[in-house]
């Protein structure tokens, strides 16, 4: 999958994230999405469409993961928590969910970025590899953190 070259412009990541959350909650309002941010605005020189795709894909993965878990586990809090903040040099994004998590992967967590690697019945395995490419093109780094309940994803962009 070839990505078009990013077109960099100054965009507000807070409103970009809010747009994606709103869209995903219209598609599925059974999950509580909490968005915490320290600033009114976080401006970042980025390709708006591409970063929007990253936000959308990652939150959608969290939603699907929570649904997957709810097929087996009945009583748990269906939460996604998203945090966006900045320092002088970096912008940090943390997405934390209560879904199935990464602990039950039969493989190394690093493999989830490989093209065509998928754990979904109808997955193509391209979602996260595209997400990773976009993040790299934006001077960023993605990290997958295992935790007991659910998954945590950290992305750090250099300004």
Task: Give residue ranges: language-model regions.
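Conserved micro-motifs of the catalytic ATP-binding
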Residues: 3-6, 43-46, 119
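A conserved beta-strand-to-alpha-helix junction within the catalytic ATP-binding
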Residues: 9-21
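Conserved catalytic submotifs in the C-terminal HATPase_c
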Residues: 32-42
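ATP-lid-like helix-loop hinge signature
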Residues: 63-88
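Short conserved segment of the HATPase_c
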Residues: 102-115
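Short alpha-helical Gxxx[C/S/T] motif in the catalytic ATP-binding
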Residues: 127, 131
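Detector for a conserved hydrophobic position within an alpha-helical segment of the HATPase_c
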Residues: 135-136
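Conserved glycine-rich
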Residues: 140-141
């Amino acid at each position: 999958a070839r990505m078009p070259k990013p077109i960099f412009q100054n965009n507000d990541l807070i409103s970009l994230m809010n747009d994606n959350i709103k869209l995903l909650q219209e598609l599925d309002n059974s999950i509580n999405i909490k968005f915490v941010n320290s600033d009114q605005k976080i401006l970042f020189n980025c390709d708006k469409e591409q970063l929007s795709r990253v936000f959308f894909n990652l939150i959608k993965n969290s939603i699907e993961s929570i649904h997957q878990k709810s097929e087996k586990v009945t009583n748990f809090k269906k939460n996604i928590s998203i945090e966006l903040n900045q320092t002088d040099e970096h912008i940090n994004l943390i997405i934390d969910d209560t879904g199935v998590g990464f602990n039950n992967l039969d493989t190394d967590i690093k493999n989830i970025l490989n093209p065509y690697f998928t754990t979904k019945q109808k997955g193509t395995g391209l979602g996260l590899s595209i997400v990773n490419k976009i993040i790299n093109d934006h001077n960023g780094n993605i990290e997958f953190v295992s935790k007991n309940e659910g998954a945590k994803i950290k992305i750090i962009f250099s300004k």
